[in-house]
Amino acid sequence: MYSKCLVSRTFVLAALVLLTGFIVFGQEPAAKVSPAPSNTPVPHGERIKRWFEMDTLSIGTRFRHITTNVNIDSADILQFQLQARGRFKFDKKGKYSVSAGVYTGSSITSGWGNTGLGTGGPQTNLYVKQLFFTAKPIKQIEINIGGIAPYYGENTEITAYDNDAFFMGERLTIRAPKNLYFDEINAVNGHLGDVTRPSVFHRFKRLDESNYHQLMVRKRINKSVAFSADYTFEAGRDTFRQGVKFSIPRFRAVDSMRFENYQRVDPEKGYGFAISGEKTFRKKLNLNGGFARIDTIMFNADRLPRGNRLFAGWNLKMTRELTLSGIWIQGVGPLPTANTPRTRVDVIFAYNILETLKHFGLQ
């Protein structure tokens, strides 16, 4: 029903890029004269980064406890996580590259695998969830094509899409605040589905299909206030989202506050929001908390399904590589079903391998 021709989609995207470049940005500044080559030896890590650069490389383990709406313990489980994403650069500046991301998690809202300890059997699969080409022909324009992760602006996974979500398609990002006021303008066309088939190789066939569109703007007004707004069409459903973040470092109670919400306008109407705040102590300990109201089933954070919930979390940076974090979530008031989680507690220990590689000059 929503299928479109890939050729026509690519043509429209290319035409939009060219039109924007010629009309809005005009002529590019004259090229600067390159300095004479230096005889200083290039470090080994820099030689690697010329061609290959890691964005993320970490492992973690999580204990998760869930109690349902009827006070039944439905999960006491130890899980593990791997996140690895890097890019191959065709040119030294990285204007043209191919990125790939390998992750645990067997669905669109899952980024963890079961160890076999506790509830459920072991899960050992890893999936290439992201694989996409990036082009930055000029400073103001970025194009992504392939298996991509959604972008939320100032919203978070509470009211937008889960941090582990994925889709197939194209995204055009324009960063030209001097010409277009907004810091970022994002236009997306693609297919969002195959929720239990996370491997990008099983989803490449969706590149010639379209059931997901998004138009988003984002703006930082000053050092204290930033906002975003977007319209999303997803498989027949129309949704608007807005988010605003206030940075208030002089306020002793919190460093920042965020309000985010969504309005589903068609076919069924719905509304949800979250308000949250956070405080960091000596760059080591971060405390956060808030309240969320979600009234409809969607691909948002799996730990915050339908219902009203209070949440509080913490993140302790033990060393450059090691972090210990946790979150407590408590449903308040009526919940949709007997099996809906009423209480959830997560405790996470993570090791950032990328920081170790940087320490030894390998990235």
Segments predicted by a language model, with ranges:
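N-terminal secretory signal peptides that target proteins for export/translocation
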Residues: 1-8
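Short acidic, glycine/Ser/Thr-rich loop/turn "cap" segments at secondary-structure junctions
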Residues: 114-117, 150-158
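Signature for the C-terminal beta-barrel architecture of outer-membrane proteins
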Residues: 34-47, 52-58, 72-79, 93-97, ...
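Bacterial N-terminal signal peptides
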Residues: 12-21
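Beta-barrel outer-membrane channel/assembly domains of diderm bacteria
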Residues: 26-143, 172, 176-177, 220, ...
